Amino acid sequence: MCIRDSFILGSDPDADRVGIMVRTSDGEFKVLTGNQTGVLLLDYLIGAKQRTGKMPANPVALKTIVTTEMARKVAETNGLKCYDTFTGFKFLAEKKDKLENAGEGKVIFAYEESYGYMLGDYVRDKDAVTAALSLTEMAAWYAGQGMTLYDALLACYEKYGYYGEKTLNLVMPGLDGLKTVSYTHLRAHE
């Protein structure tokens, strides 16, 4: 299996988010959601650390409250704790620091559904560079197993279950909408 032409990566201009398209069995490219990409990365990272004997004691995965519960299933099935934070990498990084400084766990991966991924100890924020490197490494490893990333995603569904997702956008126009959003934000950050 060759990884050539099996996936396409794209980043935003400031390289903090990365998206991926994967070739399906019918030869077409499919855009993966941030949730799907995160689950693939989490499952791969867990397996890679287990295969190499580099899984830390008390391993942890972090996700935001709007990120798929499939991540929790992947983590807990493989012996990791999984914690939720509010949306935003500020909260993910704070939780990582708090857990690790207290000796309560070592975070191996953190993400949110909006295509942001935090790996390793290099950057305490979403980072498309380390994520792209890990996605490419993952694609190469699966190619060595005779699988594409699409095959790997389907295998994750078979192993952990099928999860649906739907994004809802609420529009609150005008001054009244601004007041409602502002009050909600203030209450959430008290």
Stretches with model-predicted labels:
Residues 47, 120, 163-165, 188-189:
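Generic signature of intrinsically disordered, low-complexity segments enriched in small/polar residues
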Residues 147, 151-187:
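Mid-to-C-terminal polyanion-binding domains and interfaces
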Residues 1-5, 184-189:
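Conserved small/polar residues in nucleotide/adenosyl-binding loops
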Residues 4-159, 173:
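Phosphate-binding chemistry for phosphorylated carbohydrates and sugar-nucleotides
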